[in-house]
Amino acid sequence: MIKTINYFIQSILIYLFFLTGRILGLNLSRKIFSSLFSTIGPIFKSKLIIEKNLEIFKKNISEIEKSKIIKNMWKNYGMTFIEYIFLDYFKKNNFHVTINGEDNLKDSMNYNRPVIFVSGHFANFELMSMEITKKKINLATIYRPLNNFF
C-alpha cells in the first residue's frame, strides 16, 4: 500500500515536471532540469552506488574527477528526463542524431541481413530505435518495464 502511494506521488511530481517542461520549451527545460538534477540528484541513496561504480571503472580516480563525472551524469539525466516529452519533436526533425556507419545499415537492408543493435542508457537512448524505424527497418525492442505503474 505504501509503495502504491509513493508511486502515485512520484507520478504526480513527474507529470508536473513534464507539464512545466512543455510550457518552457526544449532548450530552457534542458537547462533547468539539468541544473535541478545535478543539485538534488546527489542526495539520493544511489550516490553510494555511483561512487562504487566509479571506483570499479577507474581504481585511482581523484575526488575532483569523480565529482565532475557525477555532476555531468546528473546533468545528463536531467536533460534526458525532460527530452521524453519532446520525442514527437525529435521524430519530425533529424538534426539531433548523427548515424556513424550508415553504409553498414544500408548494406544490412539491401542484403536482408539480420542485425543486432546494442544500446544502453547513453543520453536519450530512445532516439536510436526511432531513427532506425524511420529507415523502414523492422525492429524488435527489448526493455524492462518501469516499476511505477502510474
Q: Model features per residue range: what roles?
A:
Residues 111-150:
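Catalytic core of membrane glycerolipid acyltransferases/transacylases, capturing the structured
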Residues 2-119:
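Membrane-anchoring hydrophobic helices of lipid-metabolizing enzymes
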